[in-house]
């Protein structure tokens, strides 16, 4: 059964998430108001409101038990709606005043964790460890100093995950859902392929797992034994698109980390276009179903952005990395 949760304009396209008990939906409205929707009654409760001098930015992410979240706010005086990739590039050079904060989902109380005059994004609690928060220095991947950072929840011990090598870009970091590692993708100027890396937050060691076709986004199953990625073309979020030119790839891939092999699942055939002033609604952002039997992804292959499920083949044709 399909139900529409909200009917008004300016709802955050990506920020919605469900509570673990499936009783509540949380989302951000107008870049400012965090709302909780009761999925039984559809009643809305305002959890948190961004102050007038700030604007809520990007995706806000809850901890494992959904008792609090981390998010990014940008000073209103620096804010520009990021409606296309040229504005994305220009905004990086502005050096906007940003702050990483946490919000209690019950009381609505907030606390600033980290603050800089640099573009911050992609905040993520480490699963099952509220003490550790990942965030990024946002912007064109070939211009940022170092993309991935960790900070303790109390604001102490800010540390970078990886120092970039010359010509290296790193992107789309995520925590393995069991909290064991941070996984990300590295790619080098002038090369078609990409390398999947694993960062151990306890030891601080970065380990190259395997090479892969050029994918825009990666996600793993619960324990990180399988990864899924969406084949892509030349990245739009770099300054030197000529130096990072790659062939377009319309496939969804699953990667077996232990075997260092992978297989194709299905074509996503998305256009990667900006739609309704949103830069990412056509991006596949694939993920596994809870039982690892299928892939959930987005595409506009049939005209408008929609969500699809592709079942994993029973006998896949494995390819070597």
Give short role names for the model-derived ranges.
Residues 2-7:
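Short, small-residue-biased leader/transition segments that mark boundaries at the very start
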Residues 11-17, 54-61, 120-124, 168-174, ...:
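Repeated scaffold domains used in trafficking and secretory/extracellular systems
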Residues 20-21, 64-65, 127-129, 177-178, ...:
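Residue-level detector of Asp-centered blade-edge/turn motifs that repeat once per structural unit
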Residues 25, 69, 132-133, 181-183, ...:
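Hydrophobic beta-strand positions that form the internal "hydrophobic ladder"
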Residues 30-99, 108-118:
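Asp-box/WD-like beta-propeller blade repeats and closely related beta-sheet repeat scaffolds
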Residues 71-95, 136-145, 187-189, 229-249:
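Short, conserved, GDST-rich strand-edge loop motifs in beta-rich repeat architectures
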Residues 209-219, 260-287:
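Conserved blade-ending motifs and adjacent loop-strand segments that build the rim/top face
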Residues 282-321:
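Blade-level signature of beta-propeller repeat domains, shared across WD40, Kelch, NHL, RCC1
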């Amino acid at each position: 059964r399909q139900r529409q949760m909200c009917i008004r304009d300016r709802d955050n396209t990506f920020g919605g998430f469900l509570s673990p008990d499936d009783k509540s939906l949380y989302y951000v409205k107008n870049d400012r108001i965090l709302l909780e929707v009761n999925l039984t009654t559809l009643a809305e409760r305002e959890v948190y409101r961004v102050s007038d001098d700030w604007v809520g930015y990007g995706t806000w992410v809850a901890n494992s038990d959904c008792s609090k979240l981390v998010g990014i706010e940008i000073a209103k005086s620096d804010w520009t709606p990021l409606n296309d990739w040229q504005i994305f590039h220009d905004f990086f050079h502005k050096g906007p005043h940003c702050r990483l904060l946490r919000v209690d989902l019950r009381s609505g109380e907030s606390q600033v964790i980290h603050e800089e005059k640099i573009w911050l994004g992609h905040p993520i609690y480490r699963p099952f460890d509220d003490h550790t928060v990942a965030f990024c220095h946002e912007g064109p991947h070939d211009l940022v100093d170092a993309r991935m950072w960790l900070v303790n929840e109390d604001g102490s011990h800010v540390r970078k995950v990886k120092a970039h090598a010359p010509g290296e870009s790193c992107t789309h970091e995520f925590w393995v859902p069991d909290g064991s590692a941070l996984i990300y993708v590295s790619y080098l100027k002038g090369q078609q392929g990409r390398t999947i890396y694993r960062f151990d937050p306890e030891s601080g060691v970065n380990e190259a797992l395997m090479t892969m076709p050029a994918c825009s986004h990666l996600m793993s199953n619960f324990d990180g034994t399988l990864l899924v990625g969406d084949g892509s073309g030349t990245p739009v979020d770099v300054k030197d698109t000529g130096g990072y030119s790659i062939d377009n790839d319309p496939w969804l891939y699953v990667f077996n980390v232990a075997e260092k092999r992978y297989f194709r699942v299905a074509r996503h055939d998305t256009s990667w276009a900006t739609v309704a002033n949103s830069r990412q609604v056509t991006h596949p952002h694939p993920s596994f179903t809870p039982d690892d039997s299928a892939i959930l992804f987005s595409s506009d292959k049939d005209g408008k952005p929609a969500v699809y499920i592709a079942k994993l083949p029973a006998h896949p044709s494995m390819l070597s990395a």
